[in-house]
Amino acid sequence: PNGFHLNGDFQRKGYSEFTYRPFTLEGNMFSADALQEMLFQMKNGKIRLFPAIPEEWKEKGVSFQNLRGENGLMCSAKIEDGILTWKIQSEKPQKVSIEAFGKVMEGLLEAGKMLTGSQNMIKYRICKRKE
């Protein structure tokens, strides 16, 4: 979706019978949704942590708490000092796949129990040895 929305014809151009300029939340909610999608995504049991954040955020640190996923899942995660940590809790048992920065981890969530994890994000550059 592109976020375009026509609600009322306050300029009286014939687009709608409603000629008032109503207050709408689409623009505000669109930006909040985009930010959440940068931090956390979930579809069909596959969780993606920080899938679209800028490199600068990874270096400075970023976090979110208690974002809802599908099937009663609640997730919190943070990046601090090059370490990603996360906590996931579910209202019902389910298998999940957690993807972050090219690595995939799988786990079984029990109802009411917390699944936690950590991942070192520091990358090393390997160079050919000069002879």
Task: Specify the residue positions occupied by each region the protein language model found.
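Non-catalytic C-terminal accessory modules of carbohydrate-active enzymes
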Residues: 1-130
